[in-house]
Amino acid sequence: MLALPLLGAREPTTGPLTTHPWVTACKDRDDRDKPGPAFQVYRNTYYVGTCGVSAILVTSPEGHLLIDSGTEAGAEVVLANIRALGFDPKDIKLLLGSHEHSDHIGGLLTIQEITRAPIVTSFEGLNVIASGQATKDDPRYGTLEPMRSLPESSYTIEPSPILRYNEPKAQFLLDKFGVWPIPTPGYSPAAMSWTWRDCEGDECLTIIYAANLLPVSRDDYKFTDNPRYVHEFLASLQRIADAPCDILLTPLPSASKMRDTLRAGSLNASYAYRCDSYTRFQRSLLIDRLLQEDPEWMKKNFPQGIK
């Protein structure tokens, strides 16, 4: 698989160093199924994932929503973390995913069996979740672990356990929970980011769970052979860069420097890693990848460079 450095040079954080339980238990780029403690991100938003892979719980009196599940094994950690916070997984009314790979949504059907909550995803994501197989236009197609699949009858009849985010029922649920989708294809064709407002008294913050935006692939894949996909990738980066972003969360905690920020203090502090820094770095990796693949293609398609 062609890969790029995950984070590059670290940006220094400032603030008082603290001993956060998650920092003590977990390392950067830790094992994807290693249990880590749940913690409150802000008001009604909680981190309930493993040490290596994120899962986010957003709570409300009317029910909760969960974004990502980790692997099938990781889903058991997620469920245990939800219970450890005092919440009942059966009160989860909506399931969302960041991108259609087994390390992030491989346990989503396991959690759905317990919660009976619908999964809201993109059109492409529905096909992957239902079949358990990545699509051929995924840059990592052929290298990904398969996931559990659903029999066709279970998602073509009502009530369907999987909804496309632009369906009326899905839009009703998203509006009810105050969460909005941001399509972000790039790392995978069906990648989705999610944003919501969370309030502590009169202070409301915008939280973004931004999909992975690394330009990685199988060895024989070239982004420069797929110019339309490159433009979609760049548009995804711009959507995240332009979005209000008080707190950044990512499917891989290390991608948003979560451990560094927690070690220094709070995820909503002024020194926290946010969407502008995140997308600037990911864009630089994409540019490097395109130049590595075909410098002449870059000159022809982006004569002024990629801003």
Residue ranges and their predicted role:
Residues 31-85, 89, 193-215:
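Conserved beta-strand hairpin/beta-sheet module of binuclear metal-dependent hydrolase folds
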Residues 274-307:
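C-terminal regulatory/interaction regions
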Residues 45, 73-76, 83-171, 278-281, ...:
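Active-site HxH/HxHxD metal-binding segment of metal-dependent hydrolases
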Residues 2-14:
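Bacterial Sec-dependent signal peptides at the C-terminal "C-region" and cleavage site
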Residues 24, 45-47, 70, 95-98, ...:
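Short, flexible loop segments at the rims of nucleotide/cofactor-binding pockets, characterized by
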Residues 44, 58, 68, 99, ...:
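Divalent metal-coordination and catalytic microenvironments
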Residues 11, 15-17, 21-27, 34-35, 64, 71-73, 153-154, 160-162, ...:
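Metallo-beta-lactamase
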